[in-house]
């Protein structure tokens, strides 16, 4: 195995929960303000996951004060403190961009039942 692959595997976080598009997640992000560091929570629906390995990212969407806000997070970033899966969603697409056009009850996602 070459050096780049070994380095990339060392950077992978082992404690990432299993989640997919449609799931509602709570992402705890480390925010640095001057010398202070605090944790900011961003909760919303995962609308996509892309890439693989160290460069894998996921996008979370939520509506805040009537405005849709989307944030893309690198999955293995040291800034992402932890990810909690709040609710499992049942969707039939891998990219949920159609949620951008929907408002209110139309933007709801069915719940996935676990066995």
From Swiss-Prot:
Q: Which GO terms describe its cellular component?
A: cytosolic large ribosomal subunit
Q: Which UniProt keywords apply?
A: Ribonucleoprotein, Ribosomal protein
The organism's place on the tree of life at top rank: Bacteria
A GO BP entry: translation
Q: Cell membrane: present as a keyword of the record?
A: no
Q: Name one GO molecular function term.
A: structural constituent of ribosome
Check the record and name the Gene3D superfamilies matching this protein: 2.30.30.790
Main function = This protein is located at the 30S-50S ribosomal subunit interface and may play a role in the structure and function of the aminoacyl-tRNA binding site.
Q: Which family does the UniProt entry place this protein in?
A: Belongs to the bacterial ribosomal protein bL19 family.
Which protein are we looking at?
Large ribosomal subunit protein bL19
Q: Which species expresses this protein natively?
A: Desulforudis audaxviator (strain MP104C)
